């Protein structure tokens, strides 16, 4: 089995599970603990891209195991994973300066390579998408997105593949609508890259996801011709539908179908696909026939308008700005739960946030042998998608009388995933009833769940939401998920109330086939979206659960950085990588920590 990590979350199904690990067993981690082997320093403190790893690559006259890391300063590094030697670094251009125009919290110094690159091992190429200031000023309004192709051995651009400018890419949506043009000044490229049929797939959200110019884009670049081969826009008539997925990458089926999940935006089931899980098909160019990206299925739970009390099935819903929300009723559509009242928080204080409950906050992970995809967003509800026949939701399907039939298109009924509250019905005909904050905390899921087939429990999946604990589930041939247990530790225990607590758990798993599973998790102490906050690294036994006093299952911690007073800044949407006996941990203080058994 390969020990390479060539893409975000280990593989293109986005399972997050490295099943070729024989050193980092639960017994070894518990008995020996973990220590820092190497500290690798980068040129920008906020590392957003997941580290990648290639085993046994010849550089010079030496076979090496190499860690590749892209940074927000538009630099890509290659280090020897065993010695820490810097093998090369490559600068792709002047990054964009951090500002409140890009992120209201302004905790990023630079904006450059935000997404995780993808590596073509056979070709020896790393592909990265860089946000570059075209005039060198660093002003975001001069920024352009470029695709780079770097030699894995030297870090130099591949001959014949200079930086490819994506500006001006066009998409013709048909239906009598105008041709759309891609503009970098409006877009943010956070989702990890993928490769399908000889093309790099690049997904975009928007700098301001609730603006009228917000849209999701998918661009396919043919790596043989080094040209833009196809593009697709998620909201051609309306707006919104960003594809950001908290830095997760599009998930790729065995038949090369591309799965993405969109955030808040308009929905009509024809040209607008906000708040939807979408299957795309990429067809490469053939002779004089242009390449294409086309919708081949989707499923949608609700519209943003329905969340704010507008027409439940509406088409091209009004953008949900605070001023727009004033047009909607102020009481009936927002549940004022008692504990929220006790905190002095009025339901209306959530205002526009109820129209920003991104389904696409978590991305999607595929369990191909069951024919399903798992996804969850800011509501913390698990939706189990039938990836063979996702259902193709129409606006009329979202009317209360037909909601049950729309849920029936799923492979299993929705369930509460990142938390549990008996007062919340995840199979509701009226999505406005989801507008509440159980325990006065958000329970968003940011990033894909981790999936793994265990010799003990069968098919498992793990999640960890904002302000919540790590949770383990099992799922069988009936495709219904059953809760196994949770950790005692919670994310963001010191985040200020009310709400707060982004982003929850960043998790991955290492195992030796279906045995010796270890879940590796990074959680913040505070709210890692609004502020810089320290992080906490934990290792858990993935299968051998203990019992709490009430008899429920406990996921047992094997090792905890808190016990050793480790200090590192939490890397927001990033995740640890466990491979070849090492745990590679990116940080928000410019370090890549390489850990191993003590």
Segments predicted by a language model, with ranges:
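Mobile, glycine-rich extracellular loop/lid and propeptide segments
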Residues: 2-287, 291-335, 339-348, 352-392, ...
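A broad structural signal for short, well-ordered beta-strand segments within beta-sheet-rich domains
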Residues: 5, 47, 113, 157, ...
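Long, well-ordered mid-to-C-terminal structural blocks that present hydrophobic/aromatic surfaces
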Residues: 376, 381-388, 397-478
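Short, contiguous acidic/charged loop-to-helix segments that flank catalytic cores in large enzymes
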Residues: 433-440, 485-499, 525-529, 563-567
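A beta-strand-loop signature enriched in Asp, Gly, Thr, and Trp
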Residues: 471-510
């Amino acid at each position: 089995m390969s020990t390479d990590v060539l893409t975000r979350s280990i593989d293109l199904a986005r399972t997050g599970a490295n099943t070729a690990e024989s050193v980092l067993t639960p017994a070894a981690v518990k008995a020996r603990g973990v220590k820092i082997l190497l500290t690798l320093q980068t040129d920008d403190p906020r590392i957003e891209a997941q580290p990648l790893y290639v085993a046994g690559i010849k550089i010079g006259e030496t076979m090496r195991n190499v860690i590749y890391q892209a940074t927000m300063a538009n630099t890509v590094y290659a280090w020897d994973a065993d010695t820490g030697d810097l093998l090369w670094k490559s600068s792709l251009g002047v990054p964009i300066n951090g500002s409140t125009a890009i992120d209201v919290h302004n905790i990023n110094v630079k904006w450059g390579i935000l997404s995780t690159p993808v590596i073509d091992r056979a070709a020896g190429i790393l592909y990265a998408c860089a946000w570059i200031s075209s005039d060198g000023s660093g002003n975001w309004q001069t920024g352009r997105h470029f695709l780079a192709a770097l030699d894995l051995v030297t870090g130099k651009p591949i001959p014949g593949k200079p930086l490819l400018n994506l500006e001006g890419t066009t998409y013709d949506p048909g239906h009598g609508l105008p041709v759309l043009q891609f503009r970098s000044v409006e877009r943010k490229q956070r989702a990890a890259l993928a490769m399908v049929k000889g093309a790099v797939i690049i997904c975009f959200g928007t700098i301001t996801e609730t603006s009228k110019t917000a849209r999701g884009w998918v661009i396919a670049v043919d790596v043989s011709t080094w040209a833009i081969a196809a593009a697709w826009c998620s909201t051609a008539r309306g707006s919104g539908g960003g594809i950001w997925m908290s830095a997760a990458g599009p998930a790729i089926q065995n038949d090369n179908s591309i799965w993405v999940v969109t955030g808040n935006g308009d929905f009509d089931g024809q040209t607008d696909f906000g708040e939807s899980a979408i299957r795309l098909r990429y067809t490469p160019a053939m002779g004089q026939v242009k390449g294409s990206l086309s919708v081949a299925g989707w499923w949608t739970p609700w519209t943003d308008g329905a969340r704010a009390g507008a027409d439940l099935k509406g088409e091209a819903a009004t953008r949900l700005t605070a001023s727009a929300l004033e047009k909607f009723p102020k009481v009936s559509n927002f549940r004022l739960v008692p504990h929220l009242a006790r905190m002095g928080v009025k339901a209306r204080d959530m205002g526009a946030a109820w129209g920003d409950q991104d389904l696409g906050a978590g991305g999607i992970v595929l369990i191909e042998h069951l024919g399903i995809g798992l996804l969850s967003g800011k509501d913390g509800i698990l939706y189990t998608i039938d990836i063979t026949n996702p259902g193709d939701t129409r606006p009329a399907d979202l009317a209360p009388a037909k909601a049950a039939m729309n849920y029936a298109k799923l492979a299993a009924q929705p369930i509460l995933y990142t938390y549990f509250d008996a007062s919340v019905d995840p199979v509701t005909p009226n999505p406005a009833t989801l507008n509440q904050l159980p325990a006065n905390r958000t329970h968003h899921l940011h990033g894909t769940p981790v999936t793994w087939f265990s010799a003990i429990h069968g098919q498992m999946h793990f999640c960890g939401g904002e302000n919540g604990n790590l949770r383990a589930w099992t799922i069988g041939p009936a495709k219904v998920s059953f809760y196994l247990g949770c950790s005692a530790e919670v994310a963001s225990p010191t985040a200020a109330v009310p709400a707060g607590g982004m982003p929850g758990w960043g998790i991955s798993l290492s195992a030796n086939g279906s045995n010796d599973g270890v879940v590796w998790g990074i959680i913040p102490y505070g709210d890692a979206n609004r502020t810089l906050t320290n992080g906490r690294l934990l290792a858990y036994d993935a299968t051998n659960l203990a019992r709490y006093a009430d008899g429920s299952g406990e996921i047992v911690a094997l090792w905890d950085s808190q016990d050793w007073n480790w200090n590192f800044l939490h890397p927001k949407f990033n995740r640890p990588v466990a491979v070849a006996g090492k745990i590679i941990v990116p940080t928000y203080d410019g370090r890549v920590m390489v850990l191993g058994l003590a």
